UniProtKB/Swiss-Prot annotation:
Binds to DNA and alters its conformation. May be involved in regulation of gene expression, nucleoid organization and DNA protection. Gene3D superfamilies: Nucleoid-associated protein YbaB-like domain. InterPro entries: YbaB-like_sf, YbaB/EbfC. It comes from Bradyrhizobium sp. (strain BTAi1 / ATCC BAA-1182). Homodimer. Pfam families: YbaB_DNA_bd (PF02575). One of its GO terms (molecular function) is DNA binding. It is found in: Cytoplasm, Nucleoid. Signal peptide: none annotated. This is Nucleoid-associated protein BBta_7345. The lineage of its organism: Bacteria, Pseudomonadati, Pseudomonadota, Alphaproteobacteria, Hyphomicrobiales.
Length: 106
């Protein structure tokens, strides 16, 4: 019975920590860059795009395809950084609770 109560307490702690982490991920921002800094995408760790910066040298009609490719690359870079930030936060939470690595998280 004590083990069950301990597990319930641990589950409640995990739920509380997860809620706090979700709030923190919404405010944590990363920036993906491509083209040597010509294009940057800023997004939250919850994958919400917050801003895009484009160097004026790319704003030429005949450069549209290059710009499109750079935007896709910068977004991918930002997404990878956001996913890494999310994994780091998850590991910090599960480690503090003494849960095994990868405990129920993808």
């Amino acid at each position: 019975m004590a083990d069950f109560l301990g597990m319930m307490k641990q589950a409640a702690q995990l739920q509380s920590k997860m809620q706090a982490m979700q709030e923190e991920l919404g405010s944590l921002e990363v920036e993906g860059i491509s083209g040597g800094g010509l294009v940057a995408v800023r997004m939250t760790a919850k994958m919400e795009v917050k801003g895009i910066k484009i160097d004026p040298s790319l704003l030429k009609p005949d450069e549209a395809e290059i710009l499109e490719d750079l935007l896709v690359t910068a977004h991918g870079d930002a997404r990878r950084k956001a996913e890494a930030a999310m994994q780091e936060k998850m590991q910090a939470i599960t480690g503090k609770l003494g849960l095994p690595p990868g405990f129920g998280f993808g």
